[in-house]
UniProtKB/Swiss-Prot annotation, chain A:
CDD domains xrefs: SNARE_syntaxin16
Gene3D superfamilies given in the database record: 1.20.58.70
Name this protein carries in UniProt: t-SNARE affecting a late Golgi compartment protein 2
SMART domains: t_SNARE (SM00397)
Swiss-Prot record, chain B:
Purpose: Vacuolar protein sorting-associated protein involved in Golgi-to-vacuole protein transport.
GO cellular component terms, semicolon-separated: cytosol; endosome; Golgi membrane; nucleus; vacuolar membrane
InterPro entries: Sec-1-like_dom1 (IPR043154), Sec-1-like_dom3a (IPR043127), Sec1-like (IPR001619), Sec1-like_dom2 (IPR027482), Sec1-like_sf (IPR036045)
Family: Belongs to the STXBP/unc-18/SEC1 family.
Disruption phenotype: displays an accumulation of abnormal vesicular structures and leads to valproic acid sensitivity.
Record-given protein name: Vacuolar protein sorting-associated protein 45
Membrane topology, from the record: Peripheral membrane protein
Length: 301, 558
């Protein structure tokens, strides 16, 4: 892929044109400037803040979500290490490890949920937006949603592998098995885990075992919550490879929207014009009636 | 030599160079180009939340940086100058798909009062990426008033397309062309001139064997675009038309008669990538496997799914799953629609007759077969195709029957205007205007061979035909392509390269390539070690488009 940068040549051309005096004039020193106050005293002379220079407020959400996702990624790495340690057979007490795992899991799940909440808030904020800002907001949300989805899907995959190991199920999942299987099974596994804990409690089993199983159930609950979140986000996400993922299709769509909006506008305009005319006619009729009445009164006298 | 990776690395570079919130500014032509390479979600990942057209009314959004991907045309220049006099965005990064003339730069600089332009670059991506070895310039008609005369716009566009194709692949080729085609000669001269003129751009490391740019004229093989196709990609294009990766077809099985639109993109759709060259029979088997794959996944993992309602619920509950099932149902409905059309148009019989017409010795029974089909219940287009193929085959053997056939077409209910396609076709691509023979030579040896074939039993009667391009490429790869038919443009290059076996070959078919040819090129790329071929066409033809083009010619040629 060859390419050629023409910026240098272009700038040479641009400098050779004299119109750049305009810019110099602006920055040139103006003696009046010395005596100008920072805030205009004269109220009539309002300073104009051009709104189109400012990015919409919701853009900052991206930074927040970025840092949350970064945080979760770090936590997931920590968790990975803990998992690796934990599944190793040993006789020492694992309570501390388990607590740490639980803490991290809850933290990560919460972070994901916070992300989702942020998205929802932003969505509510941008509902009132119009025109290109609305479109931009929609695309913006869709991008963030798909990023959160990917991250959380990875986390869930790890969690369910761990869960399977804990429950002594066949943990040797072949790598060819797609993410798909994971999703289907991780929810199912989590549900059965929770049921089992409930069952154990009913049967009044050994307290130690119940405590262990409860910890496991916590993880399972997290998975279910995240699966729920994944579903909620799906509304926003663009399906890859589908027609809505085509750039030309999206442009066509906006053009169709713009056209229909224009039509509405014309309709409204003509409607307004008509009402004006109608009012005028009514006014004339009333006038005529009034004049007739006056005439009648005068004639009667 | 991979168009997909070349185009994607261009976009990767664009996205790297401009950070922060961006708006993408396109025009109609580049919208098609961009859509053929990347997707909306690719854009979103790069913080491009808005895509707009240069010619449209737009709001001012000066908190955004503008990435413009445009073709260097006079219209673009005018619109861009207006834009720069009153900039709508914070800064402009301009990427042009081709070489920018200096005067163009000067006029732009003149309008840039606010110094809004931050960078200008040439990224040579002036073609549509169809497959990773197939490109299209998207020009439907190329001829002005005689079959040897270029339409100015089309000529310029084709020339630009070839230049950008060469630059994006980093090739400085020697040029060979169809000796009997003035269109190819003119194009070859112009391309060669640009290569010399822009020697700075074409300054690539010299490979051991020079790459070859082979310019071919459609008129030397009018057969391929007229045949019924039997491989997936070609079939879809023949029956519904693939428009830059988008296919719309009316779904007769569903309740509403509205047409469905789908996307077929080999880079995004692994099933399509795998099956696009499979013939219809194999495709059916693969589709069945694909469906049962979906079935086993659902039953194995979630055993509670029993009814269709369960299935539906299940799909709604698991979005990742839905992606796969969406793809499965897309292909299933497409293939079922294909088989509907195959039945409706009696394509199995039509295909058999066609293949025996173009692959076997001419026989008198051919006429009866055609005659029977012309009065059967098939569409106008299919009738025209059959008649055209017969006319090309029997043009010299039996001219009386060829003209009788035209009367029969009219009697069979074909629009007389459309029947005029046949004389035009013979005038443009008839025997005396072609070189080489698209039909197998008729001599004792070939007759013996076809007899042998009959004995052994042909593997598949529907796909016996090999496009003429195949034999040209085979000759070229083995260094046997004759200079009498495909001369070098510059005689000095001939001395060095005539006997070499080329490695990198770029074939451009003036007048349009077909998916059947693309299939063979892909096959070559997969089976011939050391040989890399890219195919490009002024457009990608199916029979409808080809007949349309001939119709267009018939109204223009004096």
């Amino acid at each position: 892929m060859a390419y050629r940068d023409r910026t240098g040549l272009y700038i040479t051309f641009r400098q050779s044109y004299s119109h750049h005096g305009q810019r110099l004039e602006l920055s040139g020193w103006d003696p009046k400037e010395e005596r100008q106050s920072l805030v205009h005293k004269d109220n009539k002379d309002n300073t104009v803040i051009e709104m189109d220079m400012l990015a919409p407020r919701w853009v900052t959400v991206e930074g927040e979500i970025d840092s949350l996702l970064l945080n979760t990624r770090r936590n997931i790495n920590l968790l990975d290490k803990q998992y690796a340690k934990h599944v190793l057979p040993s006789f020492s007490d694992k309570t501390e490890q388990e607590n740490e795992i639980q803490r991290l899991t809850i933290q990560i799940t919460q972070d994901f949920q916070r992300c989702q909440k942020l998205l929802q808030v932003t969505k509510a904020q941008t509902n009132s937006a119009t025109g290109s800002e609305a479109l931009m907001a929609k695309n913006f949300l869709s991008n963030l949603a798909s990023r959160i989805q990917t991250e959380s899907a990875q986390f869930r995959k790890k969690q369910s592998t761990y869960l399977k190991k804990l429950r002594g199920l066949n943990a040797n999942i072949s790598p060819v098995e797609s993410k798909l299987d994971e999703t289907v099974s991780d929810v199912a596994i989590s549900q059965s885990t929770i049921q089992q804990v409930a069952l154990m409690e009913e049967q009044g089993e050994d307290e130690q075992a119940i405590r262990h199983e409860r910890a496991v159930a916590k993880i399972a609950e997290g998975i279910i919550e995240l699966a729920q979140m994944f579903q909620d986000l799906q509304v926003l996400v663009i399906e890859q490879g589908a027609l809505v993922d085509r750039i030309d299709f999206n442009i066509e769509q906006t053009q169709v929207h713009a056209k229909s909006a224009e039509k509405e506008l014309i309709k409204a305009e003509s409607h307004q014009k008509n009402t004006g005319r109608l009012r005028f006619i009514c006014f004339l009729i009333l006038l005529i009636v009034a004049l007739i009445v006056i005439l009648a009164i005068k004639l009667l006298r | 030599m991979d168009l997909v990776s070349a185009s994607q690395s261009y976009f990767k570079r664009i996205f790297q160079e401009v950070s922060d919130l961006k708006i993408l500014l396109l025009e109609e032509d580049t919208t098609k180009i961009v859509s053929s390479c990347i997707t909306q979600s690719n854009l979103l990942e790069q913080q491009i939340y808005l895509t707009v057209l240069l010619g449209n009314k737009r709001e001012k959004l000066r908190h955004l940086k503008c990435v413009a991907f445009l073709r260097p045309t006079p219209t673009t220049l005018r619109l861009l100058c207006e834009e720069l006099r009153d900039p709508k965005y914070a800064e402009y990064h301009l990427y042009f798909t081709n070489v920018i003339p200096k005067s163009f730069l000067e006029r732009l600089a003149e309008s840039d009062d606010f110094e809004a332009v931050k960078s200008i670059q040439e990224f040579f991506l002036d073609y549509l990426v169809v497959n990773n070895d197939l490109a299209s310039f998207n020009i439907p008609h190329i001829i002005e008033d005689s079959p040897d005369n270029w339409q100015d716009g089309a000529f310029h566009r084709t020339h630009q397309g070839i230049i950008s194709l060469l630059l994006s692949l980093k090739k400085k080729p020697v040029i060979r062309y169809d000796n009997n085609s003035l269109l190819c000669l003119k194009l070859a001269e112009e391309v060669s001139y640009t290569i010399q003129h822009e020697s700075q751009l074409f300054n690539f490391r010299k490979p051991d064997t020079a790459p070859i740019l082979l310019l071919l004229d459609r008129k030397n093989d009018p057969i391929t675009p007229l045949l019924t196709q039997w491989t997936y990609q070609a079939m879809v294009h023949e029956l519904f038309g693939i428009d830059n990766g988008r296919v719309s077809f009316s779904n007769s099985t569903s309740d509403n008669e509205k047409s469905t639109e789908i996307v077929l993109n080999p880079t995004l759709d692994p099933f399509y990538k795998e099956t696009r060259f499979d013939n219809f029979g194999d495709l059916g088997v693969k589709i069945k496997d694909y469906v049962s794959h979906l079935q086993t996944k659902s039953t194995k993992k979630a055993s509670e799914i029993e009814s269709i309602a369960d299935m539906k619920q299940f799909l709604e509950a698991y979005p990742e799953y839905r992606r796969l099932s969406g793809n499965v149902s897309k292909h299933v409905s497409l293939v079922s629609e294909i088989s509907q059309v195959v039945q409706r148009e009696n394509l199995l019989e039509v295909g058999e007759v066609e293949q025996s017409l173009v692959c076997n010795e001419p026989q008198s029974t051919d006429f009866n077969d055609i005659q029977r089909l012309l009065f059967s219940n098939i569409s106008e287009n299919t009738k025209l195709r059959l008649a055209a193929l017969y006319s090309l085959r029997f043009e010299r053997i039996d001219p009386a029957k060829v003209s009788a056939l035209q009367q029969m077409l009219i009697a069979g209910g074909v629009n007389p205007l459309k029947v005029s396609v046949i004389p035009t076709l013979l005038h443009v691509a008839g025997y005396s205007f072609r070189q080489g023979d698209v039909f197998p030579p008729s001599n004792l040896f070939s007759r013996a061979r076809s007899g042998l074939k009959g004995l052994r039993g042909v593997e598949n009667v529907y796909i016996q035909h090999n496009p003429f391009l195949k034999s040209i490429l085979l000759d070229l790869i083995q260094g046997r392509l004759k200079e009498t038919t495909h001369p070098f443009l510059n005689s000095e290059t001939r001395a060095q390269t005539s006997n070499e076996k080329p490695q990198d070959i770029i074939v451009v078919i003036v007048g349009g390539a077909t998916y059947e040819e693309a299939h063979f090129v892909s096959e070559f790329n997969a089976t011939q070690p050391g040989v890399r071929i890219i195919l490009a066409g002024t457009t990608i033809l199916n029979s409808t488009a080809y007949i349309d083009d001939i119709m267009y010619m018939s109204t223009r040629i004096k």
